[in-house]
Amino acid sequence: MNYKILVQYDGTRYEGWQRQERTESTIQGKIEAVLSKMCGEEVQIQGAGRTDAGVHAKGQVANVHLKEQVDPQEVKQYLNRYLPEDIAVSEVTEVPERFHSRLNATGKIYVYRIATGEVKKVFERRYIYDFGEKPDMELMCRAAEILTGTHDFKSFCANRRMKKSTVRTIYSIDLKEKEGEIVITYTGNGFLHHMIRILTGTLLEVGMKKRSLSSVAELLEVRDREKAGFTAPAKGLTLEKVLYSPLQKESETL
C-alpha cells in the first residue's frame, strides 16, 4: 500500500531532508527510523523536495510503500508519538501505487523571510534572516519581474558541476513588506541547489543599490555562479507547499 505523508519541521538542528550515511541527523532518516520500528522491517520514504541543512518546511510531502495495509490515522498517530518534537506529521492518506511525491509534483512554493528593522526578532531568530537594513522594495520588485518566467538559472545554482538542465520556470516572485520584515514568496516548477537563497541574495543586492537591474538580466545569459549575488542564510527559507495537478488530486482519492 502507498501512503502520502504531509510533514512539517524546524530544520535548525538537521543536516537537511535527505538521508546521509555520515549522520543520523536528517528529516528523512528520522521518519524512516520510526516507520521501520512500526513495521518491524526497513522502510524507505520518498520526499518531494530535498531541503538543505537549516531549511524548514510547513508542507513537505513524502510517500511510502508498506507491505501491509494500515489505517492512515494509526500511521499518523504513531509517527507523531515517536518523532522528535521539531518534526510533525499533519496528514497521512492512502494513494494509488503509482503516486510518487517528487516525480508527480508540478511545482513548489517557498517563502523567504528577511528582518529589516534595527531591533532583532529574538523569538523568531531561527526562521528569519536578520538583515538589519531596509532595501529599496521597488527595485527588488523590478528585479523579481526580470527573473520571473522560463530561464536558464545556472548562475543561481550552487552545484557548478551539474550536468543536467538548469532551465526552470518561476511562475511568480511576490514581495511583501510588513512590520519590519520582507516576505518573498517563490512559486515555480522546480528549483536548483541553493537557487532561492542565491536569488534572494541577488534581490537584496539590487535593493541596496549594490547591483544594477541590467546586471540581473545579464546573469541569465552568462550562466556563471560567481556573477550572481550572495547566498542568503538557510534559516530564512521555508518550503510552504508542494503542488500537484487537480487531476492528480482526484485520482488520489480512493
Regions found by a protein language model. Give the residues of each.
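Structured-RNA-binding interfaces characteristic of tRNA pseudouridine synthases
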Residues: 1-254
